[in-house]
Amino acid sequence: ATDELQRGGVLPGRIRRDGKPMILLITSRRRGRWIVPKGWPMEGRSLVGAASREAFEEAGIVGDIGPTPMIEYRYMKVLDDGSQVPCRVTVFGMNVRGTLSHWREKAQRQRRWFSLDAAADRLDDEELAAFVRTLDATPARLKPTEGWTRLKRSSGERLEGTR
């Protein structure tokens, strides 16, 4: 549909030392639902650019982002005035290398690591939840490969656990 609004998002993941894949989710600001970081592309920015910016601002995470979408899904976004608009979210894989202890939306959101099943159970969107469950068979999709872009953090930001 041409009246759909486009958003870019990330599915932030990492593989633990024991080989278990984990997904990072954040809460939505208004209703506190567990979601993936996503946002509107700014003028002249790509969907992957919007996705990486939102990962940094909404979740306080840095890492490597994949060049090709992992999944697209649709949902109805409730606007501040209560009206709803159809949105299509293009989700890129992100291998999380670090979490910031201070980030722009820290006071407005929670951020938590989940196993794939636990993440899927908490996600409202059925399509995205079903996709997250499939990652169990191919957790390597959460690892950066050739073509992934290393996201830089701004100077002055400190990663948790670093001095």
Residue ranges and their predicted role:
Residues 90-134:
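NUDIX/MutT-family hydrolases
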Residues 1-36:
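N-terminal strand-loop-strand
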Residues 56, 60-100:
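Active-site segment of metal-dependent pyrophosphate-handling enzymes
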Residues 36-70:
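The catalytic Nudix box helix
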Residues 123-163:
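Charged phosphate-binding loop/patch that engages nucleotide di/tri-phosphates or the phosphate backbone
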Residues 6, 22, 85-92, 110:
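Short beta-strand micro-motifs in enzyme catalytic cores
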Residues 1-5, 45-49, 57, 72-76, ...:
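Polybasic/polar functional segments that serve as interface/processing modules
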Residues 35, 86, 113:
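Short aromatic/basic micro-patch
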